[in-house]
Amino acid sequence: MNLWTDDNASMMEAFMASADLPAFPWGAASTPPPPPPPPHHHHQQQQQQVLPPPAAAPAAAAFNQDTLQQRLQSIIEGSRETWTYAIFWQSSIDVSTGASLLGWGDGYYKGCDDDKRKQRSSTPAAAAEQEHRKRVLRELNSLIAGAGAAPDEAVEEEVTDTEWFFLVSMTQSFPNGLGLPGQALFAAQPTWIATGLSSAPCDRARQAYTFGLRTMVCLPLATGVLELGSTDVIFQTGDSIPRIRALFNLSAAAASSWPPHPDAASADPSVLWLADAPPMDMKDSISAADISVSKPPPPPPHQIQHFENGSTSTLTENPSPSVHAPTPSQPAAPPQRQQQQQQSSQAQQGPFRRELNFSDFASNGGAAAPPFFKPETGEILNFGNDSSSGRRNPSPAPPAATASLTTAPGSLFSQHTPTLTAAANDAKSNNQKRSMEATSRASNTNNHPAATANEGMLSFSSAPTTRPSTGTGAPAKSESDHSDLEASVREVESSRVVAPPPEAEKRPRKRGRKPANGREEPLNHVEAERQRREKLNQRFYALRAVVPNVSKMDKASLLGDAISYINELRGKLTALETDKETLQSQMESLKKERDARPPAPSGGGGDGGARCHAVEIEAKILGLEAMIRVQCHKRNHPAARLMTALRELDLDVYHASVSVVKDLMIQQVAVKMASRVYSQDQLNAALYTRIAEPGTAAR
């Protein structure tokens, strides 16, 4: 694919010389920093820094090419992932239309070994494409190197697809919200595409897929968008974005491998512009929902404030603890030194401090005072006014004698304010009044803890401030506003540190029964009712588990099924007790019958009365079947007596055997108990009675 055709012959010249792309500072590294202004022109210099920079060439003052190149190289070389290139798209302004767009800031290309080892096509079209790419690369090298480069210097190596995509990117720009970088800047959210480049709704992503790229990342920063590309599929992890931000900001681990720049502290304003600091929202017109403003006359046109930042959110920046402004007696420091002081103070405070310190500040004179923004109680920025007690600032400042915030030139926001002029006696009286107000408000805060909770939304910690030693007198009410602010701050601190919360008095225990579960105090009726219902539900769950047949799942049906089951169990218990009593009565009658029977005669009689001696009976029972073995003398037909006894005992015979050995007869019978069931002892006793006593057997 040839994205750099010969039809547009002026693209190269427009790319290198156009003022519409100010984000391409090839010589920004060699440009010396501007000399510091003289001290007596401090007001004019500060006004120039407040106004927005010209749209034609903001890049020369906003970037240092060497530092930006180091940032991009640290990402490529220091990441665990394999990135092919890194491009920083800088935010700029189109001079013709005035719209914001993203243009080429700088880039770093590493390449891919697999791309170089890939076999190239030997077709004439591929060869012509390579010649075209080499010619464009030679022109770029000659333009960058200047007059010292040889005109006939040739590019020996082939220009790979990814390298060509990187070169073509130099001529591209993206309006806000269009293209992958423009969408990332507009949404203020990182974009990570790892598997869907071919189907992404962006021409640049589809072109990247055509040239062999598989992963693209666009990360919005303060003044532009950082784009990364790779020929590998790299998925996003939880720490990918923070690591890339740390490498781009030249963290301690990444910056230790680079030699320090000789003028890094003075000639590198990208420390303030490129560092991805916490976002701020600084606007010219402050909404009434955030800060209540008394209605003063509008400020002069030359005092209009301009704040520039890449992203917007609420006030989350923390300015330096002591904010100073040079006075006529104090010469203004050079901008380079002021910038170093501001960077050191920001490094000490840390980038994520969310406090806003407005306790002590000074201002210089020489012009009319801008309006003083006095916050009301209960709003977003609470400066310590107690809304619970209905008090207001006892000394409101008039519009003509008010003070506001000032910072050193070159910081993120600045404002011209008059000098606070106060005589020595006025300062002494104001200090006494300040201490008295702090004491009275501290005692009032202890009586109103709700006010302290309302005022604790933002912490305005007090910090030491270097005040000018000389100057003209200022109205006492302006100093009174400062003292009132400090007093309210000390009031919050004293209420938190000095006055501990009183111990909660123990309520007397009520007389009555001791609370359950070892509780010290009885519960209220709501808690007791809740526990009673939980206990009742647990009982119903246990009852449902033991009832076998549950018709419905509601509590009424469960109770009815439980009652029916209990009645059924009670009926079974009654029937079993009746059967037990019947069996016990039968056993008693059998015992009485056996005891009442007359003893057998000792002597033998005739054939029917002769006793069969030496009778051995053995019965074994297995379930409803019994095996009977009888051994006796063969006289008096013992086999007939055995069959008669079995008939009387209602035993069914399904196997019988009789054998005679001399005078002994051995009988083995297998019977089945059909109607009555005997135990082994009962069967032995019944057979012995009927076989051993012939008289009983004959009956």
UniProtKB/Swiss-Prot annotation:
Chain residue ranges for the region called Helix-loop-helix motif: 534-569
Sequence ranges assigned to domain bHLH in this UniProt record: 520-569
Positions with biased composition (Basic and acidic residues): 478-494, 517-530
Alphabetized Pfam families for the sequence: bHLH-MYC_N, bHLH-TF_ACT-like_plant, HLH
Listed SMART domains: HLH
Gene3D superfamilies tied to this protein: Helix-loop-helix DNA-binding domain
Amino-acid biosynthesis listed as a keyword: no
Its biological purpose: Transcriptional activator involved in jasmonate (JA) signaling pathway during spikelet development. Binds to the G2 region G-box (5'-CACGTG-3') of the MADS1 promoter and thus directly regulates the expression of MADS1. Its function in MADS1 activation is abolished by TIFY3/JAZ1 which directly target MYC2 during spikelet development.
PANTHER family: MYC, TRANSCRIPTION FACTOR MYC2
Protein family per UniProt: Belongs to the bHLH protein family.
UniProt protein name: Transcription factor MYC2
Species of origin: Oryza sativa subsp. japonica (Rice)
